[in-house]
Amino acid sequence: MADPVRLIVGLGNPGREYEDTRHNAGVWYVDALARRQGVFLTEDKKYFGLTATFSFEGETIRLLVPTTFMNRSGQATAALANFFKIPVTQILVAHDELDLPPGCARFKQGGGHGGHNGLRDIISRHGNSRDFYRLRLGIGHPGSADRVTPHVLSKPSKADRDLIDRAIDEAVHNTADMLRGDLNSAMNRLNGFKA
């Protein structure tokens, strides 16, 4: 068994102009998980984000949506993790993933940042540790590098958003395995899903 997850972070950019953009897929996941748990995210300036907690099998699980911009996501993640003494190996970061098509989602542990500025900052703010879990939410690639920024900062089509939402629903359904530290089960179940 791997370490159980105690902090779940949803990456995105703050503000109404970004809330429906592909780059906020991680936020969509945390919002969906909060709804399923019946909790509400509220602003907590001490942690530079929106936070909530819920109980799972006697353990406190913390949710965080940084209200910093994407490239400063580590500021919020480190502030909360350090205060509650949550090791990096017990953090799950949900983020948009260019290398997966809409409708696909994958759990994994460790790895690089793959050019994702939110992951880059989290790695940097946690002593260059890459050992946190990731939930990679497919948003598709626009085809060329010069189109990546406009792609991630734009809204997906209705069809793509429906696929992303279905993948998020499946990820939420499989989050319990991550909270128990059963990465293999979570990966196997989610990797077998295709919206």
UniProtKB/Swiss-Prot annotation:
Going by the UniProt record, its keywords in alphabetical order are: Cytoplasm, Hydrolase, RNA-binding, tRNA-binding
- Any single Gene Ontology cellular-component annotation: cytoplasm
| Any one of the GO BP annotations | protein quality control for misfolded or incompletely synthesized proteins
- Site annotation (Stabilizes the basic form of H active site to accept a proton) points to D96
Pfam families recorded: Pept_tRNA_hydro (PF01195)
Subunit-structure text: Monomer.
Query: Which family does the record assign?
Result: Belongs to the PTH family.
Task: Tell me the protein's name.
Answer: Peptidyl-tRNA hydrolase
Ranked from the top, the taxonomy reads: Bacteria, Pseudomonadati, Pseudomonadota, Gammaproteobacteria, Oceanospirillales
